[in-house]
């Protein structure tokens, strides 16, 4: 999948992957409809950080979740 092109499909993939990696229980905060496509680069950057980092501490997960909530519509 080419994540370089902003699209709703790519954003959904990123959000689903982040939800799994961050072990988010309440998946309703990860609905693609709740994010503007103009925030795609922010989401992609977070996705790349999480994938690169691998294992995240509880504090790091919480920080990512807070960042996600700040860029929601």
Curated annotation (Swiss-Prot):
InterPro entries: UPF0435 (IPR009507). Pfam families: DUF1128 (PF06569). Belongs to the UPF0435 family. This is UPF0435 protein OB1527.
